[in-house]
Design a protein with these regions (language model features):
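Functional cores that coordinate and move charged inorganic groups
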Residues: 183-397
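Cleavable N-terminal signal peptides of Sec/SRP-targeted secreted and luminal proteins
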Residues: 1-15
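Solvent-exposed loop/turn segments at secondary-structure junctions
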Residues: 66-70, 113-116, 127, 139, ...
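Active-site neighborhood of phospho(di)ester-bond hydrolases with catalytic His/Asp-centered motifs
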Residues: 61-64, 106-112, 116, 138-144, ...
Length: 633
């Protein structure tokens, strides 16, 4: 009797909850749908005045990790069509700020320009350099993925560019020089701005120091960099900043870097920093990572040497401060940007006033935003998001639309890119975006490794989730998304490996710095401790039952050519294992996925997202705050 009453109560509670949710969604739909068709203003806060009576504000428009994405990503669901990104819209923001501040602004980029977007691949990166030229980029530093290409490729991009590569911590041992790109590379750069203050002409100079990531030395796949060294950050930054401030008398020093920084990850592993605002130092925000290279650098160097940071690499929204130093960074693929405003005192010798510095962002880059969130992206797991209309919008009173200065780029490249717009299949079974990494889940990796097993007949398939460079959304899947997700051009390979080596290999993979590797055909148990993660067991798993791996039995494994040639943690595996019956003639990874999905026409992803049957199970034995990671069959 008690059980029946309990069940009835649960049913009634859920019924009321369902009815309440529908009332709320009906109200919101009615509220927003009754709005006029006029574009909404998204910058609803106190803005920086270019004619401020106390300060001269110089805006620094910051981007990073564009990863070859010139065109917007377009998503089509049954009742919802939206897009995200598109450098036409980015340029509109830049030109709005440029006009407001009478061309006295800096546009800087934190690197990782080319590797990723199909449009960059099929144009050899030229479309991205053309964009930066048209948008009047003032300088960029190099990301780790710039070293995926041969030096000759990068030399050609440098020749095409109307802006310098600002990098101070590279060293060419052969030429005994810090310049590896000749006159197109500078160690530091100084930008000068002239103003009239009290009928007197004054000048403000901003010095920029560029840094690229030291760890790149272990990830270079392009040729021609054998003699290149990556130097330590601290000594170079201190020396260059002192030179800029003491000898060249700049008013402020900005660090332009690609060395990684993140703030505000919630316990779910989600970046929570997407609220557009005008931020100041004392605003309450989520804490920043204390173990990041940027944090360590800013804490280690002498106070007063750096005044601001524009950085990249971590694909996170950052509009935060370390000490008195404002830092901006953004997510990948040109989906957002930030503006950092440096304040110089008109009444005190144009000295920088850290307390008056501001950060405006993150700016949504897209054709239309969701009314109610002011974001371009579909907010997964939200019952209300599909009912929020997608509307035109304004920034600082100006409608965001395609900037006409980009027309020549479209005339040059659109026809080639449009060949990849066909829909190849439909993703069903979820309303969530399928991310390469999300709250410890690797849904895309589960799908891709399963495709590799089915295509090659392998028993086990392995991929690094960091080799997956974009996300899928439910609904129609266009051809170009396949090549955005797997842009590196690696071949799919198979090889035989004995069971004892399989177990040893997985222990290396799942305890290394690039863990966790996504795998199909096995089930794993990982222990998390204060000293790190380690694999407790790995067994064959066909989706229904587990079997022990026999030490002497050989198993057919599939992985990409980058890994089997010693990329990432596989360099350690190749110390004890020599690939047997290696075959790499299946074609490129992206081509394999494209062929497979085109034949399927639809793919139901529910089995890859079923948390009742995880293929990696974690036992947490750490006292530290960790993000619990799950993988699903």
């Amino acid at each position: 009797m008690f059980v029946n009453l309990f069940l009835i109560n649960i049913i009634l509670i859920n019924a009321y909850k369902f009815q309440f949710e529908h009332l709320i969604t009906d109200y919101i739909k009615s509220f927003y749908n009754n709005k006029s068709d006029e574009p909404i203003e998204i910058a609803n806060y106190d803005r920086i005045n270019s004619d401020d009576p106390n300060y001269i504000y110089i805006p620094i428009f910051g981007t990073s990790d564009i990863h070859g994405h010139f065109y917007p990503d377009k998503f089509k669901l049954e009742q919802l069509n939206y897009s995200q990104g598109g450098l036409d819209y980015m340029t509109k923001y830049i030109n709005i700020i440029r006009e407001e501040f009478d061309n006295k602004m800096l546009y800087l980029d934190g690197g990782d320009l080319f590797q990723g977007g199909l449009e960059s691949t099929i144009t050899n990166g030229s479309i991205i350099v053309d964009y930066f030229n048209y948008a009047k980029l003032k300088g960029l530093t190099l990301g780790n993925h710039e070293f995926d290409y041969d030096k000759q490729y990068m030399d050609e991009k440098a020749d095409q560019a109307n802006f310098p590569f600002i990098v101070s911590n590279l060293y060419d041992k052969a030429n005994k020089s810090r310049k590896i790109y000749g006159d197109k590379q500078v160690i530091t750069e100084i930008y000068s701005f002239k103003y009239n203050v009290n009928n007197e002409e004054v000048e403000i100079k901003i010095g920029v120091i560029g840094l690229t990531m030291i760890l790149t030395k272990n990830q270079i796949t392009g040729g021609g960099f054998d003699n290149i060294e990556f130097k330590d950050y601290k000594s170079i930054v201190e020396a260059e900043a002192k030179e800029l401030k003491n000898s060249k008398k700049v008013n402020a020093v900005v660090l332009l870097s690609h060395i990684g920084f993140w703030c505000g990850y919630s316990g779910t592993g989600q970046d929570v920093n997407f609220t557009l605002n005008m931020y100041k130092k004392d605003d309450k925000q989520e804490p920043c990572a204390q173990d990041s290279n940027i944090t360590k650098l800013l804490n280690d160097i002498e106070d007063g040497l750096l005044d601001a940071v524009v950085t990249g690499h971590s694909h996170c929204e950052v509009h935060h401060w370390i000490k008195d130093i404002p830092i901006i960074s953004t997510v990948n693929n040109g989906a957002y940007a930030n503006i950092l405003y440096l304040a110089f005192d008109k009444k005190n010798k144009l000295k920088l006033v850290p307390s008056a510095n501001r950060i405006e962002g993150p700016l949504p880059i897209c054709e239309k935003v969701f009314n109610g969130t002011h974001r371009c992206d579909f907010i997964e797991n939200s019952k209300l998001a599909p009912f929020l209309p997608i509307v035109n919008y304004k920034f600082h009173g100006v409608i965001i639309e395609k900037d006409e200065s980009m027309n020549k780029i479209h005339e040059k490249y659109d026809e080639l890119y449009n060949e990849y717009q066909e829909t190849i299949c439909k993703i069903i079974g979820t309303n969530e975006e399928l991310k390469r990494y999300d709250n410890g889940s690797f849904y895309l990796g589960n799908i891709i490794t399963d495709i590799y097993n089915k295509y090659t007949g392998s028993q086990i398939s392995i991929i690094s989730y960091k080799g997956i460079r974009s996300n899928w959304s439910p609904g129609d899947l266009p051809k170009y998304k396949i090549y955005d997700i797997l842009p590196f051009g690696n071949n799919l390979c198979t090889f035989l490996m004995r069971g004892e080596h399989v177990k040893k290999a997985f222990k290396i993979l799942q305890s290394g710095p690039r863990r966790f590797y996504v795998a199909s055909g096995v089930k794993q148990l990982v222990i998390r401790t204060d000293d790190g993660d380690y694999l407790s067991s790995v067994k064959l798993f066909d989706g229904y039952e587990e079997k022990d791996l026999e030490d002497e039995e050989e198993y057919l494994i599939s992985a990409n050519s980058f890994l089997i040639n010693g990329g990432d943690e596989f360099q350690k595996i190749l110390r004890f294992y020599k690939p047997k019956n290696l075959r790499c003639d299946y074609g490129k990874e992206a081509d394999v996925v494209f062929k497979f999905l085109k034949e399927q026409k639809t793919i139901d992803v529910r089995k890859y997202m079923d948390d009742k049957n995880p293929v990696i199970r974690f036992i947490n034995k750490t006292n530290k705050r960790v993000i619990h990671t799950k993988l699903y069959k």
